[in-house]
């Protein structure tokens, strides 16, 4: 009996269980669970449609982490003049080892020192040192372990097309940046910014480029972004001192002069040259240079955000007593792709130098986000979350699902008689609060009564509240989970590249084409869009809202073979053949480009098919999924090597197939797959799974695939024809073979 009594639950524990069960079935819990489920559904759909296309931070990464100062990177520029510089991708410099045809900016990113064993969040403030045919690049790298700047150095043996990270040249206990490197009397010096030390230091190379020793302290002031130049018999030092009284940060400039870069230094009579208005470019933006006898100074326009852009000034007068400069055109075209460009939001530093050949080379840093972006995104995200929670709570109160009761005794303190005199003021205050809360409670009750009535106005009110809640859930997901909001390009072996997009269309699809061009021109790696115009009156290039050049190639004959016609004006090896009725994210396009660069001998696309059977039969992607593999990629959305693919398609051996395609106005993509398979014994196709893709061909009256069954019957006949001419297609390749999961 005693044992049985011990096992029987006590009355208090039973009451606790009953209370918990009642709470679980309470209207408040049910309402909150339903609201959370609805918010999760809305957030999940928004994440899938929008946020999943962004390049999200890798939780396992040791470098390139979100940073409030930005995500700075460094690009290369060339020209016959420092006033007419073009980015490296327009110069046709290539690197076959990384499938970069051409190499594209940025050439150095946070990944450069990170992969070299020095995890970094960004690289900025680049300075060149030219030594014969070798370029050395000194730059600030924000080290992850200390969260401060160190000076890194890289070397290029091919005029800047490829860079080798050599290591950290200078590391102090304080933040370092702006590594101004120069040569004087056969010694190489570095004058970095280290304003936290409150002095301007000069270092000398003991074993260039990695070993340096302190030569001397030039000036006992925390000078910012100091630049030297020898001009008209004197050495001039341009810098900013933000500790000077009455000046605006990033808006001050002062000048000093000396007979030697080692000092001593005297102040210019007009100091400070600038003291207000951050848009004037007072803060230095790189090395001063002399061109055709004139002296030029780059400065930073810091209006709106720090380092918004570089402004160039031509110095018309520089003496010990006078100074005058006027703005001139920098000569570098600004990025138009916003966050999808590596320098789309800001660029604040340039170093241009003349080579022995007479040409000019320059390095410039850039960022795709404004200063403080990661902090702002977190703030907006949490605000959206809190507003959504507040709206849910409000609706719960109004609908009666959530209630809040404060007993009257809460406002009456329990005290001993001896403490009454001390407690009376608190008691009076509590009574006031109680009266106010009672009044608020009556108003809430009245509001609940009004809103509980079933009227059109109340229904509209709650619909508006629901819409605001949905918007705020999307805001929270966008800013908290969306990274920096950019659809960034991927590197292969540390380098970026570009591709040309080719689409074939007709007059009847012009409306579709305009949407197509506007969307895809914003993708970071797109160099040019070529429109193969097969039929009808063609538009002009300026009819499109595009951030890249659009070229209309008018064909004489309306034939699907025109899709793969050789085009000597295409400047990239990689071509993305994409139908104008397919829309997908730029991020998925960039993934496909990266996969193609890993295997440029393959066709890499987004629409797989499995062709088998006896006789061969054409089926949809669902069949390939059932077979768990594929052996054909549709060229309506596929990357290929234009030099190989186009020449192969227009070779003599492909003539019979081309004639069949022209006759049936179909199957050009199948023919290309057979030609690839016939040319190699190794793998020729690879699939990339897009997050989502919209195919509007079924909505078009001119699409050849709008009648699905007829379309499939024609393509089945094509398979039999091409197999008899060119042999079988390759074996099946399984889905999900890539480690990154992009082919699932």
From Swiss-Prot:
Is Methyltransferase included in the keywords of this UniProt record? no
User: Which molecular function terms from Gene Ontology are attached?
Assistant: glycosyltransferase activity; metal ion binding
- Here the disulfide bonds are 667-718
State the UniProt keywords alphabetically. Answer: Disulfide bond, Manganese, Membrane, Metal-binding, Transferase, Transmembrane, Transmembrane helix
The residues listed in the UniProt record as binding substrate, with positions renumbered to this chain, are 534, 558-563, 579-581, 609, 665-669
The topology of this chain with respect to the membrane is: Multi-pass membrane protein
Name what cofactor the protein needs.
Mn(2+)
Q: What's any GO biological process attached to this entry? A: lipid glycosylation
Which Gene3D superfamilies does the UniProt entry name for this protein? Glycosyl hydrolase domain, family 43, Spore Coat Polysaccharide Biosynthesis Protein SpsA, Chain A
Q: Where are the transmembrane segments?
A: 31-51, 378-398, 460-480
Q: What is its EC number?
A: 2.4.99.-
Q: What is its biological role? A: Essential protein. Glycosyltransferase that mediates the glycosylation of glycosylinositol phosphorylceramides (GIPCs), the major sphingolipids in the plasma membrane; acts as a HexN(Ac)-specific GIPC sugar transferase. Responsible for the glycosylation of a subgroup of GIPCs found in seeds and pollen that contain GlcNAc and GlcN (GlcN(Ac)). Maybe involved in the maintenance of cell-cell adhesion.
Protein name according to UniProt: Glucosamine inositolphosphorylceramide transferase 1
What broad taxonomic lineage does this protein's source fall under?
Eukaryota, Viridiplantae, Streptophyta, Embryophyta, Tracheophyta
- The gene that this protein is the product of is GINT1
